[in-house]
Amino acid sequence: MLIVLTTVPSEDEGKALAEKIIDARLAACVQVLPQMTSFYVWEGETQREAEHLLLIKTLGSKYDELERFITANHSYSVPEIVAVDCERASNPYLSWMKELLG
């Protein structure tokens, strides 16, 4: 199981992307977290932007397709896409994910 993180500039974009990911069966669950402030360097300048974080729960076998999907459907030219390997999760949750995502 992976938890994939990506950020978007608005709640509306986050909800739209989350729904598309779920409809495509690329993840079992996507959560859109409330607004936060991100700091990063872009084109040599420090940026400070309001963003929303998506937590995407999926299987490792879905990662490559999910990454391509996010890249194709994201408003950023270089979206943050970071996968964290989940060391442990409850057996019922993992079974549900595997059944849903294949």
Locations of regions flagged by a protein language model:
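Positively charged, small/polar-rich N-terminal and surface patches that mediate targeting and assembly
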Residues: M1-G102
